[in-house]
């Protein structure tokens, strides 16, 4: 689920002369090389080592979408990885799917990705386990183009319309069809247009009638006269349309390494739990300040801070133990459109023995 492609933020300029994984970057890094994994975010966010770690560097890859980043950078900034004896290198990827591929391919030790990507990877034969949650709602809203805002007021109104998406076979496509069916609408009457990463402008210009976006694209479209038909970054909409919490971002590991890494995994979850608590306590400005300069270069930081202030309570849990029911809701959505086999169960890809232990 490449929600990082739909946020409306400009991405850092590619740094082409940086080496790949063999170069150590103390606190944050980048995975380069399309031969290794497709769609990596090629920028290095430099950090300063804050203390001696007891263990070797571990690499944790994750999506570079702005709303995915805070739990990990706030944890790092608070020194909680270091306090647990961990030397964690945060590896910024261009999307959740790329981070999942890096984990499955053995390029990184852990990956923080959307749960739908984990399920789809397991469906394709990958052997990975999800063991900790850092975002409990999908970072998505169905934005209506400004020129259609008065015409589209329900999922039934999507019949005969064109909806933009980054790529075919995505969670957003499944979610559209799933929600249309629940509303009694005919999903066969909607057209999906593949727009690639630059999805904001086509919606703003009315080249498509609607599209699944995240922030700040949603706020920018609202300023232009658009609106959200549904915003799953808000608890009320998630409860109304999805039935409650809907598992999104969290950390996974290769199943074969669980036994050897168990204590390390527990230390990682303890650090992240402290980071999630800090994320709710500190000022929104401090969240923005914790992000790497390369990531926020050219970004309206005041707007970004407002977004963190608005959504942090709804998006980020204070306890990262996996909610099995929330995970099953994701699986049900994917099964509806055949993205995973009917026999795939969310619980089979979870390791519930780590968090809280």
Question: Across the structure, where does each feature detected by a protein language model lie?
Answer:
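N-terminal secretory signal peptides
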Residues: 1-26, 38
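Short, glycine-/small- and polar/acidic-enriched structural segments
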Residues: 3-4, 53-195, 202-205, 209-215
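N-terminal export signals
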Residues: 22-23, 29-49
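Short, solvent-exposed loop/beta-turn-alpha elements that line the ligand-binding surface or hinge
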Residues: 83, 234-244, 313-322
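Sec/Tat-exported extracytoplasmic proteins
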Residues: 107, 112, 122, 162, ...
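Pocket-lining segment of extracytoplasmic ligand-binding domains
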Residues: 198-201, 208-292
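Secondary-structure end/capping motifs
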Residues: 258-339
């Amino acid at each position: 689920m490449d929600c990082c492609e739909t946020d409306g933020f400009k991405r850092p300029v590619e740094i082409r002369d940086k080496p790949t994984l063999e170069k150590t970057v103390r606190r944050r890094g980048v995975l380069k090389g399309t031969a290794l994994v497709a769609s990596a975010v090629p920028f290095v966010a430099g950090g300063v080592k804050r203390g001696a770690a007891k263990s070797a560097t571990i690499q944790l890859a994750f999506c570079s979408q702005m709303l995915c980043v805070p739990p990990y950078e706030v944890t790092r900034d608070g020194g909680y990885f270091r306090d647990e004896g961990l030397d964690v290198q945060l590896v910024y990827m261009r999307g959740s799917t790329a981070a999942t591929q890096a984990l499955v391919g053995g390029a990184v030790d852990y990956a923080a990705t959307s749960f739908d990507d984990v399920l789809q990877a397991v469906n394709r034969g990958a052997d990975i386990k999800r063991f900790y949650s850092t975002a409990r709602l999908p970072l998505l809203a169905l934005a209506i183009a400004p020129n259609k805002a008065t015409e589209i007021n329900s999922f039934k109104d999507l019949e005969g319309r064109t909806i933009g998406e980054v790529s075919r076979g995505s969670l957003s496509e499944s979610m559209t069809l799933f929600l249309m069916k629940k509303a009694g609408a005919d999903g066969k009457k909607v057209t999906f247009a593949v727009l690639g990463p630059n999805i904001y402008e086509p919606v703003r210009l009315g080249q498509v009638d609607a599209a699944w976006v995240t922030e700040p694209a949603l706020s920018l479209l609202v300023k232009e006269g658009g609106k959200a038909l549904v915003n799953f970054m808000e608890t009320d909409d998630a409860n109304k349309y999805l039935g409650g919490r809907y598992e999104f971002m969290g950390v996974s590991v290769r199943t074969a390494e669980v036994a050897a890494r168990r204590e390390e995994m527990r230390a990682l979850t303890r650090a992240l739990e402290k980071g999630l608590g800090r994320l709710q306590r500190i000022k929104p400005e401090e969240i923005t300040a914790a992000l790497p300069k390369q990531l926020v270069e050219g970004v309206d930081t005041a707007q970004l801070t407002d977004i963190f202030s608005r959504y942090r309570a709804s998006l980020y849990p204070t306890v990262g133990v996996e909610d099995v029911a929330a995970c099953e809701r994701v699986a049900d959505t994917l099964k509806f459109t055949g993205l995973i086999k009917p026999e795939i169960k969310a619980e089979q890809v979870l390791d519930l023995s780590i968090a809280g232990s």
